[in-house]
């Protein structure tokens, strides 16, 4: 099971987009307080559309509360300070749940946490002049990298609204 963990997220639209990614991939979403928004904010609802009702969302009072409720050896941290790319990790060798931790939009994950977990810190390769990518894009990229390595377990690539053969019905 993949768990996406947002450390003190600030922007409701990003969290809404991540809710959509988590629902579509059967990933569990953990939100670590304080949050920079309320869970009923319109931007959160608009970005998450109607997916929130089908997404397993767990809210934690702080980092310590999250760790206490989710003791795991499989924490992976997405941070601009990571020295490895997600593809440098072999997620097929991980037994048990995989936790993908992303930081708040303004300052990331608390550096005191990162300091003790440098071997599982990762960053997305980009040009040297780019500081960062959007949080929800980073979440989608890393979730799908893990799923790619695991061969997309339990997921379908059939188009759900128009059917798998929709393109075959188009006349030239």
Residue ranges of each PLM-predicted region?
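Post-transcriptional modification and biogenesis factors for structured RNAs
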Residues: 1-172
């Amino acid at each position: 099971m993949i768990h996406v963990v947002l450390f003190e997220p600030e922007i409701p639209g990003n969290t809404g987009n991540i809710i959509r990614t988590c629902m579509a991939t059967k990933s569990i979403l953990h939100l670590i307080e304080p949050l920079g928004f309320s869970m009923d904010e319109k931007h959160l609802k608009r970005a998450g559309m109607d997916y929130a009702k089908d997404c397993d969302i767990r809210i934690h009072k702080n980092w310590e509360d999250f760790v206490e409720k989710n003791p795991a050896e499989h924490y992976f941290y997405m941070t601009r300070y990571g020295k490895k790319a997600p593809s440098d990790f072999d997620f097929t060798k991980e037994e048990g749940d995989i936790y993908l931790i992303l930081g708040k939009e303004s300052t990331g994950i608390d550096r005191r946490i990162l300091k003790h977990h440098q071997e599982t810190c990762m960053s997305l390769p980009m040009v040297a002049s780019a500081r960062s990518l959007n949080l929800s894009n980073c979440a989608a990229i890393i979730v799908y990298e893990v799923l790619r390595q695991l061969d997309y377990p339990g997921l379908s690539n059939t188009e759900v609204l128009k059917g798998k053969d929709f393109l075959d019905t188009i006349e030239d």
